[in-house]
């Protein structure tokens, strides 16, 4: 009897642990609706994507959505679409740049908090077809992604401060609010999302703006179930619901309650979690939408961020704000292409990998795939690293990934000591070939020196 009681207690403990580490799916209202495993695996294998924040607001060079009623008066902001004519937009050029930069998927802001739609929507006139440009941006990008083998994802804001039925106002908007109209807005939102899925077939939907009180946990779970009925292998981020781990670092109290397939830390590198899918979204400059002369992150910073994110178990969604005329800034394009050159030599340590097994340190992070462990060196002029090696794991050889040059190492007890040639070019990757399936290794704590 005592054994049975102990077994029951252990079962409850591990079931709660499993619910935490595997947080994903339709939430408590849809207990049998789980994340599509194959689609999630593809998403995680991609590891690196491009985020694109774009719309008429770029004509003013201020932030998308948030500047409505603040930096730009509401009436002026809402009329910007009448001037929006990005005649130099070339979907093929965008996607070829993304692909050459090593990015495996895109996410485009089809509708931000300002409510403007970048596609030809039959449910509103506040869209791209009402601009002087009169061409479907989303359609062109979807076609280009298919042409060049890049996964196509869409951003869609739940918050819509322009729509009369959305039951929250922002930026001093004087229009009255009627909470009873929110149900009409939800219908509008579902109609638009069905339109986007039917017409453009995205692999993922990246929600945002669900934090306001007029949008509820129940609405989030219902919307998730609705979308998965429309497309069973759709991947949906956690911002569809109310339990996000995002900008405010709000932690899940009961993660299994909430809908969503992966977590979305914003403008920060997520914590080391290799059993919970997550994606850091971060800007290449300071602002999400284009801003003239915005401060831009350099190549080293960008590559270090990529290594740290993937070494922690996450994806990196790196944001570019296209200019009003439809082009990427040359300096941003050049930097992204330089990232692509690094990935041409080191991508094996990024794509289709799992974070770990070594817990991240200031000097390095690690990724793994097959029988190999990849050590991403983050510190300049590092000359030596000592690593504990799990029992029964044998080291066959160690090389620098980019050129295949051997790295001298010594084995002492259950540790290996790597002797590195000092380098000022970081990150660089050391490939450790073992005799075991490295993805099965447990996390090795930071008792390294």
Indicate where each model-derived feature is located:
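Mature catalytic domains of secreted/periplasmic carbohydrate-active enzymes
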Residues: 22-449
């Amino acid at each position: 009897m005592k054994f049975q009681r102990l077994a029951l207690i252990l079962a409850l403990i591990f079931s709660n642990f499993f619910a935490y580490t595997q947080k994903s799916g339709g939430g408590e209202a849809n207990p049998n609706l789980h994340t599509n495993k194959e689609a999630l695996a593809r998403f995680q294998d991609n590891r690196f994507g491009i985020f694109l924040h774009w719309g008429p607001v770029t004509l003013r060079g201020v932030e998308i959505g948030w500047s409505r009623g603040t930096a730009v008066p509401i009436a002026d902001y809402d009329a910007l679409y009448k001037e929006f004519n990005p005649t130099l937009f070339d979907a093929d050029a965008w996607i070829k740049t993304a692909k050459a930069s090593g990015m495996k998927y895109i996410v485009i802001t089809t509708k931000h908090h300002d409510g403007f739609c970048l596609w030809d929507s039959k449910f509103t006139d506040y869209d791209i077809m009402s601009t002087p440009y009169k061409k479907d941006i989303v359609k062109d990008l979807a076609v280009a992604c298919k042409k060049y083998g890049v996964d196509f994802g869409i951003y869609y804001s739940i918050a819509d401060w322009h729509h009369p039925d959305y039951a929250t106002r922002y930026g001093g908007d004087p229009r009255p609010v009627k909470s009873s109209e929110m149900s009409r807005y939800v219908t509008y939102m579902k109609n638009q999302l069905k339109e986007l899925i039917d017409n453009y077939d995205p692999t993922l939907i990246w929600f945002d703006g669900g934090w306001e009180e007029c949008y509820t946990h129940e609405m989030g779970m219902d919307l998730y179930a609705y979308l998965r009925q429309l497309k069973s292998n759709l991947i949906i981020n956690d911002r569809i619901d109310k339990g996000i781990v995002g900008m405010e670092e709000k932690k899940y109290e009961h993660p299994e309650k909430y809908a969503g397939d992966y977590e979305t830390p914003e403008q920060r590198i997520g914590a080391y979690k290799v059993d919970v899918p997550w994606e850091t979204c971060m800007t290449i400059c300071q602002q999400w939408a284009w801003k003239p002369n915005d401060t831009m992150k350099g190549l080293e910073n960008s590559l270090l961020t990529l290594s740290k994110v993937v070494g922690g178990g996450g994806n990196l969604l790196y944001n570019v704000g296209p200019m009003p005329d439809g082009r990427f800034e040359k300096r941003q394009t050049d930097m992204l292409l330089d990232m692509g050159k690094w990935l041409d030599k080191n991508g094996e340590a990024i794509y289709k990998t799992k974070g770990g097994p070594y817990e991240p340190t200031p000097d390095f992070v690690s990724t793994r795939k097959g029988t190999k462990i990849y050590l991403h060196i983050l510190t300049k002029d590092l000359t030596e690293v000592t690593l504990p090696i799990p029992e029964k794991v044998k080291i066959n050889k160690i090389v620098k990934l980019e050129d295949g040059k051997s790295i001298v190492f010594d084995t002492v007890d259950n540790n290996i000591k790597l002797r590195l040639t000092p380098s000022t070019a970081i990150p660089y990757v050391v490939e450790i070939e073992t005799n075991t399936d490295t993805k099965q290794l447990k996390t090795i704590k930071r008792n390294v020196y």
